[in-house]
Amino acid sequence: MHETTPYDVIMAGGGLMGCATAYYLLQADPTMKVAIVEMDPDYTRNSTVLSDGNMRVQFNLRENILISQYGMERLKTFSEDMAVGDWRPQVDFRQQGNLFLADEANKANALAGLALQQSLNCEVEWLEPAEIKARFPLYDE
């Protein structure tokens, strides 16, 4: 007869979201029994590793901006926070930026989002078409 281990939570997938959820559940209640079921135990071919991920703050919803800001702050100390003995996980994150384009029909909504982002100390700016063309000559009108 096989013995079974009862778990409070079983995470299906151990990518970024699965591992983060398990981590924060255990931070909230260290007595909780959490299991992560991941098809790629070496973490060499799972969705997080293979993604060309992007973190951004250009949202029109305050909560989304705050979540992104929190994630960016956590990345700064992630290797130290997740250290096990002398081993430190390697974080290969390179912050670059994004360029979002808006047509006249969506300009007011984009400007409202910009104001919200700036009110939350996001480093974002509005560029007019001529400024975009000067900074990014690959884009043509």
Question: Locations of the language-model features?
Answer:
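Dinucleotide-binding Rossmann-like beta1-alpha1 core, especially the glycine-rich loop
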Residues: 52-138
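Short, flexible hinge/linker loops that cap or flank conserved catalytic cores
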Residues: 1-4, 28, 93
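A structure-centric signal for secondary-structure junctions around beta-strands
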Residues: 6, 31, 49-52, 95-96
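Beta1/beta-strand and adjacent pyrophosphate-binding region of the FAD-binding site
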Residues: 2-17, 35
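Flexible, glycine-rich phosphate/dinucleotide-binding loops
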Residues: 18, 43, 108
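Glycine-rich FAD pyrophosphate-binding loop
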Residues: 26-49
